[in-house]
């Protein structure tokens, strides 16, 4: 079965996570994604280990798990485009592509004749997605940007962590590079929008994506809490700024996440907790009142939750329709029956022998389902086949370029 984007080709010049994540989504949807890497070293994340993939004999390879998370379904081609011969090859690939993804510093590719203006001149239908820390304009445009610093600069860390005054209080980053991931998702959305526009106009366009823009946009309700009041939200640990009770609570053997989203659910929770009077208490009648009286209600709940194990709470609360969850580590996540049933852990055969584990795409399309065609590629694994089949180079030409260090 053909993928939804099987008729599209992507030239992925990006490295690390935000750009490769966008490229992997497009590849999962069927696009032919050609990942261009530096000869000899490739994407920085290839070396971001341990852990590293093990081969069929159980020995460590040079393929870091980090790299493996964002590069499946792609072909890897090594080209040194700091050299004229390499620039020519990239331009020829761009002429045969629908989309380019890059995350070099502003102006970084112009020196090699690989910026949007240069490639548009040879392919006016090209969609060119530039991902940077701060965008193509503004006083920070030329600065490098990394997920961790953008989480800090963009306000996310000011909202994450224990409240001031508690032991261990202070700003905390999210446990994954969320700003990079979200930027990859927004980039994919922008690329698909540009493709839809091109279908009508036959004209490509430049996409200017910035990690900081994405981070600020994703402050969502917390941004609006500030913009509507002028008061900056503070860290609340696992608590919610607008809903109570909506946080973690201690149990007899761990923690319980309680996510009471409305007054009806609160009444059910109070009854299950053996504290039905809470639902009729004037301080707790509505969510607005519970938010106002958070400091009084939360200690009362904590005094009750510690008397049952987490699994017991989950069982009785789910039985009456109160949303809740245990706090799972990743071993429990991938053993969870729902995760197993949805097939979120998969394996793909790898060029080094053995198999490479992967997290499946969450996208479920009824007519054009995601296909897992190939494992994340070895460095330069497809250089010869791409240059020979797509650009028409002869084997001798490829060998000559390789000997000269261009490939």
Residue ranges of model-derived segments:
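N-terminal helix-loop segment corresponding to the beta1-alpha1 unit
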Residues: 1-190, 194-200, 378, 384-407
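Oxidoreductase and adenylate-handling cofactor-binding alpha/beta cores
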Residues: 162, 184-204, 217-228, 270-277
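Conserved Rossmann-fold dehydrogenase catalytic segment
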Residues: 136, 166-177, 199-215, 234-241, ...
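Flexible, small-/acidic-enriched active-site or ligand-binding loops
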Residues: 285, 349-400
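Aromatic-enriched alpha-helical interface/lid elements that frame and gate functional surfaces
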Residues: 242-320, 324
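Glycine-rich beta-alpha junction loops
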Residues: 40, 134-135, 211-216, 253, ...
């Amino acid at each position: 079965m053909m993928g939804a984007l099987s008729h599209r080709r992507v030239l992925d010049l990006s490295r690390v996570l935000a750009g490769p994540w966008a490229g992997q989504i497009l590849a999962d949807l069927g696009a032919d994604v050609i990942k261009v890497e530096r000869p000899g070293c490739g994407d920085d994340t290839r070396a971001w280990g341990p852990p590293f993939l093990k081969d069929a004999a159980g020995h460590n390879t040079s393929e870091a798990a980090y790299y493996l998370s964002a590069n499946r379904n792609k072909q890897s081609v090594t080209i040194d485009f700091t050299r004229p011969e390499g620039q020519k090859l990239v331009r020829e690939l761009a002429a045969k592509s629908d989309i380019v993804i890059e995350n070099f510093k502003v102006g970084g590719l112009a020196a090699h004749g690989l910026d949007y203006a240069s490639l548009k001149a040879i392919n006016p239908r090209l969609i060119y997605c530039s991902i940077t820390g701060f965008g193509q304009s503004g006083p920070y445009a030329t600065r490098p940007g990394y997920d961790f610093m953008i989480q800090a600069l963009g306000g996310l860390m000011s909202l994450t962590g224990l409240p001031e005054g508690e032991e261990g209080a202070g700003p905390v980053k999210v446990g994954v590079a969320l700003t990079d991931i979200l930027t990859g998702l927004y980039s994919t959305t922008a690329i698909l929008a540009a493709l839809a526009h091109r279908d009508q106009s036959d004209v490509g366009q430049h996409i200017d994506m910035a990690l900081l823009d994405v981070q600020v946009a994703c402050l969502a309700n917390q941004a609006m809490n500030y913009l509507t009041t002028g008061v900056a939200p503070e860290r609340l640990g696992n608590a919610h700024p607008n809903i109570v009770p909506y946080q973690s609570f201690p149990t007899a053997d761990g923690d319980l996440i309680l996510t009471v989203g409305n007054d009806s659910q609160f009444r059910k929770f109070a009854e299950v907790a053996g504290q039905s009077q809470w639902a009729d208490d004037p301080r707790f009648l509505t969510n607005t009142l519970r938010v106002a009286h958070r400091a009084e209600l939360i200690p009362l709940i904590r005094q009750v939750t510690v008397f049952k194990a987490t699994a017991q709470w989950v069982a009785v609360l789910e039985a009456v329709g109160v949303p809740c969850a245990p706090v799972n580590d990743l071993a429990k996540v991938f053993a969870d029956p729902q995760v197993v049933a949805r097939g979120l852990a998969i394996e793909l055969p790898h060029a080094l022998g053995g198999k490479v584990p992967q997290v499946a795409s969450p996208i479920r399309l009824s007519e054009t389902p995601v296909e897992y065609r190939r494992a994340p590629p070895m460095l330069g694994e497809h250089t010869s086949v791409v240059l020979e089949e797509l650009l028409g180079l002869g084997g001798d030409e490829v060998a000559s370029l390789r000997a000269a260090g261009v490939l």
